[in-house]
């Protein structure tokens, strides 16, 4: 739901897009950021999201080299989502972690509807 602005939900959506970028840049990858960072990202976003955004930059360089259109698309998606908040919260409550997961899975469903993921 792109109209929801609560931070935990929006961060879940952002995490999903970052994972999609990773998968698009590295189609044969077996361990994704979801496997490695999901639990930490939904509990302590201020610590984990800077790491994820650095990884995104590496993946975007690869996309720019191999799939320029995908890079532009994902930059717009990340920009739209990040425009909904000013800071990464240090911690999310258990209820907020549930909203993070909901945002993640809603964004995943949107991706499948659009046929972006294999």
Describe each model-derived feature in a short phrase.
Residues 1-118:
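Intrinsic-disorder/low-complexity detector
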């Amino acid at each position: 739901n792109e109209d929801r602005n609560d931070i935990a939900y929006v961060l879940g959506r952002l995490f999903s897009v970052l994972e999609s970028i990773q998968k698009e840049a590295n189609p044969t990858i077996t361990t994704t950021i979801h496997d490695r960072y999901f639990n930490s990202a939904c509990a302590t976003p201020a610590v984990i999201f800077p790491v994820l955004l650095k990884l995104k930059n590496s993946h975007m360089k690869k996309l720019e080299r191999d799939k320029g259109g995908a890079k532009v698309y994902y930059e717009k998606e990340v920009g739209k989502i990040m425009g909904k908040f000013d800071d990464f919260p240090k911690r999310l409550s258990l209820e907020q972690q549930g909203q993070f997961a909901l945002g993640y899975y809603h964004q995943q469903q949107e991706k499948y509807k659009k046929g972006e993921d294999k």
